[in-house]
């Protein structure tokens, strides 16, 4: 039986205080009926004695405390899930945005998910091919990993996200692959780009999109990634699919969290963000992984824009603590016209060693990766030295390394937006680049691999 109250004390911004309530639970779903009969939804944020603080999803515009009816539903927010969600576009609360019919749910799941017993987790160890050399070759993505992309305002992270969503695949398995795409606080233009790109390339058929626009309520933005992950958990653990969850932009999510925290008059932490920002982000990122005995898996690629390109900002800083590495986009590479502008030196995939090698990619992958990384770093140093002292001060070997760095950026890092490179193509480009350097400089690659894979100069 629903409990209905007309005891609204005050409404401030997206918050409503209801008095004289009984048996109300934290996170409980709330329905608010306006004087005109319109139904709005909210969620219980806090309970103190007989008072409940309710957060409104659709905002408080037009509400009158004298004629509002508040009903506490007795359950938390749930998402109706079904395999039919593939190919559909939803808003941040799981309602159809593509003018299609409502989904007939196979079951309804709490969007906060169930915690995974750490002993039930399986270690990520299978290679996911994104078709992007800078990721596949040097910062390999592994099934069940959470690997964020740190971008900056104006950088092409939207195009990169769409490209990964189109191209990602698990090699050597017959399991189905799906993409769940959650967009938070994006513009109409960006939303149209994602939807039209997926439809044009046919990727929409294996994708579920949850889109929260910049003019949608902040509280809806907080629910969006949880809706997406609930859908992903259903597809992974009930339908045995490999699911890649791409979430953009986590900075907008954290801004919404700060906005709601300020409305609740909570004590702010660093730069005004709530003190529980780390814990809140962990409840999202830790829903990635694999479970023993289950075929499905959830791999996460959260994307965030670093305010003022600052890696020490609380959002990238805390994200880096929780996730297993980071891929950093470079403004300098972007100015050179290189797409994707992935800066491979500060980028890192902590699980890359587990997803490469014989039977996964190729036996020479680890050695080649180490050699390319070291050679590019040496080439960057040589170029910096040339700026200070002039090219005449460089040794012949340093000049070769400087040439290697330029070629590496132009041929290995750079690729077309529609270019889907196989791991064999990526490795072949890497070996071809090493022909620029003398064989004596290839100290990180075993001789048998050099004999087997290094092309002759001039081939």
From Swiss-Prot:
Classification via PROSITE patterns: ATPASE_ALPHA_BETA (PS00152)
Cystine pairs: none
Membrane-spanning parts: none
Residues spanning the signal sequence: none
SUPFAM superfamilies named in the record: P-loop containing nucleoside triphosphate hydrolases
GO molecular function, one term: proton-transporting ATP synthase activity, rotational mechanism
GO biological process, one term: proton motive force-driven plasma membrane ATP synthesis
Superkingdom of origin organism: Bacteria
Keywords assigned by UniProt, alphabetized: ATP synthesis, Hydrogen ion transport, Ion transport, Transport
Homology family: Belongs to the ATPase alpha/beta chains family.
PANTHER family (UniProt xref): V-TYPE PROTON ATPASE SUBUNIT B
Functional description taken from the UniProt entry: Produces ATP from ADP in the presence of a proton gradient across the membrane. The V-type beta chain is a regulatory subunit.
HAMAP family recorded: ATP_synth_B_arch
Protein name as it appears in the record: V-type ATP synthase beta chain
Organism placement in taxonomy: Bacteria, Bacillati, Bacillota, Clostridia, Thermoanaerobacterales
